[in-house]
Amino acid sequence: MRNTLPPLASASDPSPAARPLRALGAAALAEQFALALQRADGLAGAHCVHELCMRTAVPAQIESALERLWHCAASSIPDWLPMRYIHCLPLLYDTAARFHGARRGCSNVYLVLLDYADRGGDPFGLYVGMSDYTPAQRFDQHKAGIRSAGCVRKRGLEVLTGPTLHLQRLARAEAARIEAELAAALGEAGLLVQGGH
């Protein structure tokens, strides 16, 4: 294998929404992923897996890539990479990208993946929330029963950080507006949505 591809990580790492590997063909993307595994570079590998997700690759291919990446580079994988294949991930990014806050503050909009596999149909749902805590902290609070939504406490699988990275540290009023509008937009797109109030 040629080691001609440059490392992806830099001082200003790109957001997953920017899709820095979008221009790569399938072979070059596979080569970049193999190199990331060889270097135990979780960030570069995460961008490769993310690109597979956004291209709607075969679910088994994405699950296999996730497993290999976690095995080789667990300590350096960014928190925006989901831990499992999520069929609606491209839709989440596209929908969340339509929302922006103009005023800065300390409130964060976040998404939680919910497990609805026991209900038949789509195995996943989403919870849309807003908090002054980081999304990961707020998820932990939900799971611990602290001011928690029952659906997150019982069915919450993980925080989906990537789609809402640009919706962090917003003014409270803007975050509340975006929370409600994002929940409505995801529901209109056909997803099972909780929260958004």
Please report, for each region that a protein language model flagged, where it lies by residue.
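GIY-YIG nuclease catalytic motif and its immediate N-terminal context
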Residues: 2-133, 137, 177-178
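Structure-specific nucleic-acid interaction/processing domains
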Residues: 93, 99-126, 132-197
